[in-house]
Amino acid sequence: MYVVNPEEKVIEIMKQTGIDLAATLPCDRIKNLLPLVSENFPEIKLTREENGVGICAGIYLAGGKPMMLIQSTGLGNMINALESLNVTCKIPLPILASWRGVYKEGIEAQVPLGAHLPSILEGAGLTYTIIGETEKLPLLENVILDAFENSRPHIALVSPKVWEASECCAWQAAGMPIKPEIMERTCRFSLTSGTLKPFMLRNDAICTLASELDDEITVTNLGVPCKELYACRDRELNFYMFGSMGLVSSIGLGLALRSEKTVITFDGDGSLLMNPNALLEIAKEAPKNLIIIALDNGAYGSTGSQETCALRYIDLEIFANACGIQNTAKVNSKEGVIEAFRKFKAMRELSFIHVILKPGNTNAPNIPMSPEEATKRFKETLDVKKF
């Protein structure tokens, strides 16, 4: 009689519970599971776990049912995002975490975090379920269902013992990745001895672009940028960030992958530098309906305008090019912003507009909605309009 391997059981549970996208980062203990995930689901292969939190949030907001499959060490860089985005905004996310450091662990460095993970998750108020042996694997169904029914993250800590007796050979069958003999990469940029002089404040650029919006979806960076957009032009298709710095364009990527509408992210230099992996994932997935607006004033505007590396050292447009984003522009005027936006919107290709700005904030008031209320309004609008 054929016995279902635990890896196959996971795939079965994911299908039964309606998962329609997997965001993954590998672990040796689930190396036979991951090829099956790739075969059975649309997959985003992540470069950083926290980035996956943002991408999956965008996928969910646009109507999808994503799930993450990672090594448990990645939870260390995810906790703030899970708290400030998923918990605060009531965004579900089931996570299968290959639990290292607790069972026949051969790498000493895995032990400190792994041994304390249950206590850490409890202290953070994050829901988790321990799956310590193969017979407990059906609990994964409860993890997934609970995440979506209660609009929260739910983590399955899956012990290596679960896979210990498996006869699955999917990893061996998949073989090693083979680098193409010929790889064509296109990268266009220009280097000059000077830089564009800033004339506008961030609010000028935001309000200029806000006047151009029709039925586009927007995602805006936390703090003052959100407040400035709300004051300029509040729309039900605006997703406002209240935390999770660095995940603006990650959320935009998730939305763009699930929606046919143009998605615009109002990102910042500090935010992009905090999570440069976002541009790597975006360039790899290359959604044609995503326009990234990099509002670069060389400062952390919401925390006192402290200098960022973009002020003197990093050119964000060149970095976007290096990541693989081909359609870019650098502008420093309202006319330039409008021209670049209209051009890229008409092209309908992944695009990046680098806006050079002066540091400084307006006195825009706080957004008079809670994160949960703002998120609910946004998602309900997408659901009704079926974007």
Curated annotation (Swiss-Prot):
It is an enzyme of class 4 (lyase). This is Sulfopyruvate decarboxylase. The keyword Disulfide bond does not apply. Its cofactor is thiamine diphosphate. It comes from Methanosarcina acetivorans (strain ATCC 35395 / DSM 2834 / JCM 12185 / C2A). Pfam families: TPP_enzyme_C, TPP_enzyme_N. Keywords: Coenzyme M biosynthesis, Decarboxylase, Lyase, Thiamine pyrophosphate. The keyword DNA-binding does not apply. The lineage of its organism: Archaea, Methanobacteriati, Methanobacteriota, Stenosarchaea group, Methanomicrobia. One of its GO terms (biological process) is coenzyme M biosynthetic process. GO terms for molecular function: sulfopyruvate decarboxylase activity; thiamine pyrophosphate binding. It catalyses: 3-sulfopyruvate + H(+) = sulfoacetaldehyde + CO2. Its EC number is 4.1.1.79. Signal peptide: none annotated. Involved in the biosynthesis of the coenzyme M (2-mercaptoethanesulfonic acid). Catalyzes the decarboxylation of sulfopyruvate to sulfoacetaldehyde. Is not able to decarboxylate the analogous compounds 2-oxoglutarate or 2-oxosuberate. InterPro entries: Sulfopyruvate_deCO2ase_alpha, Sulfopyruvate_deCO2ase_bsu, THDP-binding, Thiamin_PyroP_enz_TPP-bd_dom, TPP_dependent_decarboxylase, TPP_enzyme_TPP-bd. Binds 1 thiamine pyrophosphate per subunit. Belongs to the TPP enzyme family. Pathway: Cofactor biosynthesis; coenzyme M biosynthesis.
